[in-house]
Amino acid sequence: MESSCKSWLLCSILVLVAFSLVSASEDEERLVRDLFRGYNKLIRPVQNMTQKVGVRFGLAFVQLINVNEKNQVMKSNVWLRLVWYDYQLQWDEADYGGIGVLRLPPDKVWKPDIVLFNNADGNYEVRYKSNVLIYPTGEVLWVPPAIYQSSCTIDVTYFPFDQQTCIMKFGSWTFNGDQVSLALYNNKNFVDLSDYWKSGTWDIIEVPAYLNVYEGDSNHPTETDITFYIIIRRKTLFYTVNLILPTVLISFLCVLVFYLPAEAGEKVTLGISILLSLVVFLLLVSKILPPTSLVLPLIAKYLLFTFIMNTVSILVTVIIINWNFRGPRTHRMPMYIRSIFLHYLPAFLFMKRPRKTRLRWMMEMPGMSMPAHPHPSYGSPAELPKHISAIGGKQSKMEVMELSDLHHPNCKINRKVNSGGELGLGDGCRRESESSDSILLSPEASKATEAVEFIAEHLRNEDLYIQTREDWKYVAMVIDRLQLYIFFIVTTAGTVGILMDAPHIFEYVDQDRIIEIYRGK
């Protein structure tokens, strides 16, 4: 008995639910039939043709999909919000089972032809036509989602630390302001960010909205439109890591060209390699940015600055290498170069010149003395005058040579005969001899002295050649060091001056706070 009661109660509930659903469906069907009896969706919903249809329009920004800098197009996902009144779509809820809203396809009713004026892909209408919501008061709400590609003028002045202002301009395509009057949705003069998804490339800074009314005259009707400004700032981490830092490091590699020794053949090779890498970065930037001639991007300024500095460094390096390999046979060093680069600049640059390369016999021989046995046949120096007097008439076979001529350029011999008739040796090495006494030398000895003089002259010339070469090398070293300091200072100043010129480079954007502000308004 109890189970049969429960079954009867359940069946009763199901019947009541089914009846209510059928009743509600019948009420909605009857309402739609009554509302659209004689309704013409092609005519503006006004009772008098002089009246305006007031349309409240708003925009909800859902996602910033992409900003194509080269084509100057912003792709965004938005929700449109349109509200207007249609006096033909009013009813009394009590007459139709308390129905408070109707959801119908948009093709059933009249709707304003609001389009995006600055559309960039040719599709001016929304693709997905969602249902319209009709309320008993005649208010019609339409919230279609749309993906727009709008034209956006890109200002590349401070790229990649740039801030862009993209606009989305909406208005009626065929109706003027005297027929369809636009107003801001719920008087919100901003874009709604309640459902916004944060972008990984851009931060939203501000999203104001403005209603523009262009007053007409007798010849031109009034026009209205609503313009939404999407002010965005680029997140710079990607470009800083992939573009800015490599460019800065490459620019300072130009300085290291002057740290290589001039004898190294890799100085010019390094400079040309850096030049080629800069060309690659210039081509990369040209593919990213629009081909505009109005302004020069910040990164292009820096690349151009680095390119010029590297070109100048290659030219200076060629000059340094040329000076490094100069010698006395091809060039003579002017006095002003010797004074500036060998005396003043090294002291100014805190450079200490290496010791000059001198021949060992010029460095270590303070004086020169006759050997104990100048010639094996002459015996001791005391016996030399006796030997000379003994040979007497054979002087024609001997050549006379002053002892003052038997000297080395840095070790001059001073010989004289003492009162005892012996040939004495002076203590010092001087060019001028204190005595003009002479001795007789055999032809073999004369040839030997000539050979010694030839060797001494050759050594003197070789030493002069080496010293001149070393002077030119040191001049090249001084220029290298000077250019190292100059290029480091100029490169540092140029890097700071160009990159720090961006106005928002150090500003932090709290995206969550901005979204919360425009969500709570």
From Swiss-Prot:
Residues carrying a glycan: N48
Residue ranges, Cytoplasmic side: 324-481
Compartment annotation: Postsynaptic cell membrane; Cell membrane
Keyword match Transport: yes
GO annotations of cellular component type: acetylcholine-gated channel complex; neuron projection; plasma membrane; postsynaptic membrane; synapse
Tissues expressed in: CNS in embryos.
One GO MF term attached to the UniProt entry: acetylcholine-gated monoatomic cation-selective channel activity
Transmembrane segments: 236-260, 268-286, 302-323, 482-500
Entry superkingdom: Eukaryota
Disulfide bond annotation, renumbered to this chain: C152-C166
Annotated signal sequence range: 1-24
Protein's membrane topology: Multi-pass membrane protein
Purpose of the protein: After binding acetylcholine, the AChR responds by an extensive change in conformation that affects all subunits and leads to opening of an ion-conducting channel across the plasma membrane.
The protein, known as: Acetylcholine receptor subunit beta-like 1
Gene giving rise to this polypeptide: nAChRbeta1
